[in-house]
Amino acid sequence: MAGNGGIIGPVNTVSAAPAVKTTKIDSSGCHTLETTTSSVDFIAVAAGGGGGSNYGGGGGAGGVLKSFCNSCLAAVPVTGGANVPVTIAAGGAGGNHPGGAGSSGGDTTIVLGGTTFTAGGGGGGGQGGSSGGGNGGSGGGKSGGSAGSGNTPAKPAAQGGPQGNAGGGAVQGGGGGGRGEAGCTDGDRAGGDGIALTINGTPYTLAGGGGGGGPTGDPGTSPGGDGGGGNGSLTAEGSAGTANTGGGGGG
């Protein structure tokens, strides 16, 4: 099971003494802006993919779209008091034993100023030495075949992207991709690290890929990426990604 995504973003308000309000949204719904709000900076994080079983690949992190700290996409102009629809889906399920592939994570969608921004769920990890990782916001790690592609569908910086990176393909049981780096960057089965941001003094680390699994008899675990990626296990079922970070599940 992978960690689901969410929305984090400072809301810029207009008043005699301009203030900035940060709102974190972890569930779907229609959220009403304050009447003084004129623009919104956002970070949208999709749900991570599930890890594969039987030395399966790690799940890819959920895609990340953001206007915050993005020179190519300014804060989105909005009308004060407007409703903002948000959809946040669940993380992908881990693969059934023996040898099942992980499921892709769900998308996160936010509608601001008439524009819909959709971050793609992470790709599921490949299964039991026989399948590649799934494509998604960040790609799932391979078990057989090839690693999943990240930033799928492609989102340029002007639309808040890129969403993420590819899964790892160095070995069977490769780590899932994270927002900050591809899977297997920090080791053969390690999940890719996510992205670290500080918003109004509060640090967030998001969208790490899940660690990959290994053949029966290999000891220990393979680490998930920073940002909620679940650890892969070389002897048992991998761990889930951390809730509300978009982290991928371990293989």
Residue ranges and their predicted role:
Residues 2-30, 39-251:
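Low-complexity, glycine/proline-biased repetitive segments and flexible coils/loops
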